[in-house]
Amino acid sequence: MHLHRTGTAYRCTVLVQLSGLPGSGKSTLAYEIANAADFVVVNTDVLKSSLIGSGVDVSDAGAATYAAALGLSSDLVAQGKSVILDSPCRYRDLLEGGLSIASDAGVRYAFIELWVPNVSVLLPRLDARTSRISQVASATDPAPGTTWEFGTAEATLGEWQEQLLHPREGWLRLDATHTKAANLQRALEYLGQQHH
């Protein structure tokens, strides 16, 4: 078990998979946890956008992104860093990869999912954010080089949410329509951190 010092207390290294739909607040929550509790964020949108920006075709960038994210997360955990893997978790390989990294390294595994009771609440959020090249551009425009997989933004987001995977037990679902502060507090409590 990796231990490192935070203030005057030691705590264990943790690998957190943070999942949810585009616009659900995953990255915001990931960075808030990182700032409050000394975690490193591995953001798949940053990795995928970098790959696409360097000339990798959109259709090939997904698998390469997840492989890079898992490899980077594994390396950081091996260095004793607590990691938040910020990515929608719709693929079994990604879920199993995170579980495997934690198991192989002998560190705690945690999983947090941001869920929305009605995906229509995400549409204004998508319009309001500044998106990266790999991300859904707005409520009317999918990620560049792609189409809405199920015809419309709302239908696609609804299907994507149903496809989200999580471990069988020991995970936390947060309502993405709750306040950022409330979700941060619940996440930190789940992770065993105190937010001051």
Regions picked out by a protein language model, each given a short descriptive name:
Residues 24-81:
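Conserved substrate/cofactor phosphate-moiety recognition/catalytic segment
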